[in-house]
Design a protein with these regions (language model features):
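Gly/His-enriched, cation/cofactor- and phosphate-binding structural elements
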Residues: 162
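Transmembrane beta-barrel architecture of outer-membrane proteins
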Residues: 30-32, 75-79, 125-133, 174-180, ...
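Flexible loop and strand-edge segments within Gram-negative outer membrane beta-barrel domains
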Residues: 19-30, 40, 44-127
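Surface-exposed extracellular loop regions of Gram-negative outer-membrane beta-barrel proteins
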Residues: 2-19, 52, 93-111, 143-158, ...
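Alpha-helix capping and helix-loop boundary segments enriched in small/acidic/polar residues
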Residues: 25, 168-171
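Residues on the lipid-exposed face of transmembrane beta-strands in outer-membrane beta-barrel proteins
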Residues: 1-3, 35-39, 80-86, 130-136, ...
Length: 192
């Protein structure tokens, strides 16, 4: 559903799908949504933001000759971003920020006649950061951009047992920062 009035714009959608699968223990369902809002501040600036979420659960029945019971994945994924853009003709740029994340709960399942797993696998992950840049076009055929990027990504994974004990598998976060200067020059309307 999209909606525009004056300098304001929006788009929102929601979806749900499901199936019982083609075999026992092969169900799947997903619910996801997306929303984007925008506002034109004036002739030079506009701001936008969006968020997307997906929650799904699926079962893996295993091979026909080696079936599985309770091989179930529960997953939540999300992403969001914010952008402030400027455009003055000969110069333009933006501040862009983003955050992506996920939470996973997985049961590896067991074979018929076997014993259920004494633990579940869990993991959380993230990827966040921002970009700040400005481009200048002061001479015909020439573009000069200066900017900085920052990113923080990582996650952790663990096993959670039915008796309450947890076994951490990994927990790591990485920070990255990069500044840059880029110049492009068109040559003979063919090469840049």
């Amino acid at each position: 559903n999209g909606y525009n009035i004056g300098n304001f714009s929006s788009y929102i959608s929601l979806n749900h799908d499901r199936t019982d699968g083609h075999r026992p223990d092969s169900k799947f369902h997903i619910t996801n949504g997306f929303a984007k809002l925008g506002y034109k501040i004036d002739d030079h600036y506009k701001v936008t933001g969006d968020v997307s979420l997906a929650k799904f659960k699926n079962q893996n029945p295993g091979e026909i000759t080696n079936p599985l019971i309770d091989n179930i994945m529960n997953i939540l994924r999300g992403t969001t971003s914010f952008v402030l853009e400027n455009n003055y003709g000969k110069t333009s740029g933006a501040l862009r920020a983003f955050y992506n994340w996920g939470h996973h709960r997985i049961d590896d399942g067991y074979n018929p006649g076997g014993t259920p797993n004494p633990y579940l696998f869990y993991s959380d992950d993230h990827n966040a950061g921002f970009l700040l840049y400005q481009s200048f076009r002061l001479v015909k055929g020439n573009s000069f951009t200066v900017g900085i990027d920052y990113k923080n990504w990582g996650g952790n994974a663990w096993q959670d047992s039915i008796n309450g004990n947890q076994n951490e598998l990994v927990n790591k976060t990485v920070n990255e920062v990069a500044g840059y200067v880029i110049m492009q020059q068109d040559l003979f309307d063919k090469v840049s």
